[in-house]
Amino acid sequence: MRTELLSKLYDDFGIDQLPHTQHGVTSDRLGKLYEKYILDIFKDIESLKKYNTNAFPQEKDISSKLLKALNLDLDNIIDVSSSDTDLGRTIAGGSPKTDATIRFTFHNQSSRLVPLNIKHSSKKKVSIAEYDVETICTGVGISDGELKELIRKHQNDQSAKLFTPVQKQRLTELLEPYRERFIRWCVTLRAEKSEGNILHPDLLIRFQVIDREYVDVTIKNIDDYVSDRIAEGSKARKPGFGTGLNWTYASGSKAKKMQFKG
């Protein structure tokens, strides 16, 4: 629902003035709007304490889920700030997966920087990565060989429809030792575990937005997300070749990039 805070943001971003035919523009603005929603809730310690009360049930739900995902207790926090600037660039010069950051300061004067990846969608799964096979394999640590060529075939064919049953089985088997690194890289651009590195998110925030309206939010730390995807990929039919991700192609890339949804 549109709370007082969320209603103000909808006004600020002019969402209701956008024609319903402008899907791309609307999606972009909603993306920025929901990033700002998080930034405002965690703007400072006064805002966080205010919105973590029963007077603001929706914002309390969001802030409580975020703190729980980080295993943090509000009583131990003496200061908080949020930002969406100075997020840095990847080694390749591109934008990181981080959309915003929150910094918590605790009673013992230590602090913790939490990079966030924030998305909104009406769908259960959203696009988390769109890269070519060379970039993917380099990032995950997959060397030249059968596994890499099977991934390349998926990219070139833009699906697994032309795979034989044996090729599907081989891709699943060969990818199994890399599953954790593969999933982690897709959502953070780093195959190894990381914490507090501004280039690599520690939390995934997924707003469910249907017909432009807030419905719910899911917030997970990276370890829990990876575990959930592996559990999904371990089901009998081995979805996503054991990764639990949807493998598809990047629109307009002409078989030069793959896209993963999760």
From Swiss-Prot:
Its EC number is 3.1.21.4. It is an enzyme of class 3 (hydrolase). It catalyses: Endonucleolytic cleavage of DNA to give specific double-stranded fragments with terminal 5'-phosphates. Keywords: Endonuclease, Hydrolase, Nuclease, Restriction system. One of its GO terms (molecular function) is DNA binding. GO terms for biological process: DNA restriction-modification system. Pfam families: Endonuc-MspI (PF09208). This is Type II restriction enzyme MspI. It comes from Moraxella sp.
